[in-house]
Amino acid sequence: GISEPYIEIFEQPRQRGMRFRYKCEGRSAGSIPGEHSTDNNKTFPSIQILNYFGKVKIRTTLVTKNEPYKPHPHDLVGKDCRDGYYEAEFGPERRVLSFQNLGIQCVKKKDLKESISLRISKKINPFNVPEEQLHNIDEYDLNVVRLCFQAFLPDEHGNYTLALPPLISNPIYDNGAPNTAELRICRVNKNCGSVKGGDEIFLLCDKVQKDDIEVRFVLGNWEAKGSFSQADVHRQVAIVFRTPPFLRDITEPITVKMQLRRPSDQEVSEPVDFRYLPDEEDSYGNKAKRQRSTLAWQKLIQDCGSAVTERPKAAPIPTVNPEGKLIKKEPNMFSPTLMLPGLGTLASSSQMYPACSQMPTQPAQLGPGKQDTLHSCWQQLYSPSPSASSLLSMHSHNSFTAEVPQPGAQGSSSLPAYHDNPLNWPDEKDSSFYRNFGNTHGMGAALVSAADMQSVSSSSIVQGTHQASATAASIMNMETNDMNCTSLNFEKYTQMLNVSNHRQQLHQVPATCPPGSAWQHSLSSQPNVADRAVYSSF
C-alpha cells in the first residue's frame, strides 16, 4: 500500500536565547531562530510533508511543555498570525516550509483566563484536552512553550478538512526568566588555580536562580562542583565560589572544563577552560631559575678563592665622651725596661735585686705594633726600688756620668732627649720582688725622700727638671694598663714638676758642693743598701 502522509520537522527552533516580549513593550517580538542559525547564516524553524504532493494548509500554535499538551495562553505574533496562532496555505512547489516571522508574545497573569477562553472559542486544541482541564490556570508554565505544527489536506471538495497528526517541537524557553534562561558564563576573574582547590573565583553570568544553579568542573568521567551558598549568588548575575580539588596530584598544568548547570532541567552553559596547577609554592618556576647548582657554586668559590667567604672586619669605633668630642688616645709611655736618667739602663731586675736573679721571670707580651716607652722624666720620678739612694749605691760614679746627654745649645728650644729602651717588668708572680714594696703594699713605687733627691748631682737635676717641664702635661694624660702604676704620689716632687719654677730649683742646689763629695756622702750614709743579705732575708 501507499504510505500515509505525515509531518516531519526539518529544523527545530532554538530552545534558548529568545526573550518573550509583552504586548505593552510596543515592539516586535522578533523571530524564532532555528537551532542551526548563526549570525552569518540565519535559519528558522522548518517542516516538510512527506508522502504527499499538493496544496496544504499549515497551522502553528503554542502548547504547554508537558503532557497533556494544552493550548498555551501566550500568543504567536508576526506575519499570517491572528488570535494568537499562525495559519497559511502552501502550494505543491514548496517541499520545505519555513516560518521566518514567528514571534512569541507573553500575556500577563491577569489575562490568562481571557486568553484560554479565546483558544477554546477558536477551537485551538490540537490534542483535544478536556475543557475543564484548560481552565486550571495554576498548571501553566509561563516561561516555556512548544510549537505545535498541524497540516490540513484538501478533500474532494477542496476544503482543508483532512488533518494530519499534530507534531510538537522542542521546548522554547524565555530567556528573560531566571529559571529557564540560557546559561552563559560572561567572565571570570581567574582561569587557573591550585590542584588542591580552594581558590576563590568571581564569575559573572546571565540571570540565574540562586537555588537552582551549580558550577561544574568536568574532565572525561571526572566531575566536581564548586563550593558556594545561596548568599554567594549576587543579584542573579554573579557567583562567588571556591574551586574543588582535582582528581589526583599533578606535575604539570592540566586543563578541564568549567560550566554552569541548572539541576531542575539539567541545562548547562557553554564550557570555559580552567587550568589546574601543580602543588608548588613557585608554580611558574621562578625559584628554580634563581637557584644555582652545586657545581656552579663550587666553581665560583674556586675562581674567587677564599676571599668569597671572608668578610672584612669592621673598623673600631672611636671613643666618644658624653659631650660628643673624640678622646685622643695617648701612647703608653712606660718602657718595658727600667731606665733612669743619668743612671744608665738596667737590663733586668737582677741588676737591681741580686736576690731575685735566681727566680724565673716572664717578660710581658706586647702587641706587634705597640712599643710602650717611658719618658725619661717619668722614669726618673718613678722607680720600683725602695729608695733612690739604694740604687745609687749599686753603681759607680762613672756609670752615672757616662750616659748623661749633653744639654742643647744655649737658646735652643729643644730639650734634652733620652733614648728609651724596653722595660722588662718583673713577673706578676715574683713574690720576692713585691716583698720589697712593704710600704706601698705592692701597689706602687716607694717614695724618695727629699734628702735623697738633693744628693743627686746638679747636672742630673738640671737635666731631670728640663725633662719634667717638657712633659708635665703628657704625664697627667698618660694611659697605662699596668696595675703597678695606678698609685703615684707626687707630693714630694711638686717643686720638681712645676715647669715655671724649674730655674729656681737650680739655685737651691749649693754650687760649691763638689759633685764627687755629694755622691760619696750619699753612698757612705747607707752602707747596707746593696748588701745581698738584705734581699736574701726575704
UniProtKB/Swiss-Prot annotation:
It is found in: Nucleus. GO terms for molecular function: DNA-binding transcription factor activity, RNA polymerase II-specific; RNA polymerase II cis-regulatory region sequence-specific DNA binding. Keywords: DNA-binding, Nucleus, Phosphoprotein, Proto-oncogene. A motif (Nuclear localization signal) lies at residues 287-292. The modification Phosphoserine is found at S264. GO terms for cellular component: cytoplasm; nucleus. Residues 401-422 are annotated as: Disordered. Signal peptide: none annotated. Residues 5-294 form the RHD domain. Disulfide bonds: none annotated. Pfam families: RHD_dimer, RHD_DNA_bind. GO terms for biological process: canonical NF-kappaB signal transduction; cellular response to stress; inflammatory response; innate immune response; non-canonical NF-kappaB signal transduction; positive regulation of transcription by RNA polymerase II; response to cytokine. Proto-oncogene that may play a role in differentiation and lymphopoiesis. NF-kappa-B is a pleiotropic transcription factor which is present in almost all cell types and is involved in many biological processed such as inflammation, immunity, differentiation, cell growth, tumorigenesis and apoptosis. NF-kappa-B is a homo- or heterodimeric complex formed by the Rel-like domain-containing proteins RELA/p65, RELB, NFKB1/p105, NFKB1/p50, REL and NFKB2/p52. Homodimer; component of the NF-kappa-B c-Rel-c-Rel complex. Component of the NF-KAPPA-B p65-c-Rel complex. This is Proto-oncogene c-Rel. It comes from Meleagris gallopavo (Wild turkey).
